[in-house]
Regions:
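Acidic, low-complexity, intrinsically disordered interaction modules
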Residues: 32-54
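Short, aromatic/basic amphipathic alpha-helical patches
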Residues: 53-68
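N-terminal acidic leader/helix
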Residues: 1-38, 66-71, 75
Length: 75
């Protein structure tokens, strides 16, 4: 993976979510490596920018990211 920042990786994930989860797993892997490199423990996502911003959508996203080893918070 290239040296991508956490904020760039999160932006790529927003774009992927809007494009029917295209390459989502690759973007999650990039986010995970960026978080490890920068020492960030949790990725913060804006609820208003999610495709499905309700509780069910947030919990589904949180669960999927947890399976990939990424802790998610919503603001």
């Amino acid at each position: 993976m290239n040296d991508i920042t956490v904020s760039d990786a999160i932006e790529a994930i927003y774009a992927s979510l809007k494009n029917d989860n295209e390459e989502l797993d690759a973007h999650i892997a990039a986010l995970k490596s960026a978080m490890a490199r920068e020492g960030v423990k949790e990725a913060a996502f804006e609820t208003s920018r999610l495709v499905q911003p309700n509780r069910q959508g947030r919990k589904l996203m949180q669960s999927y990211f947890r399976k990939k080893g990424v802790a998610v918070a919503f603001v």
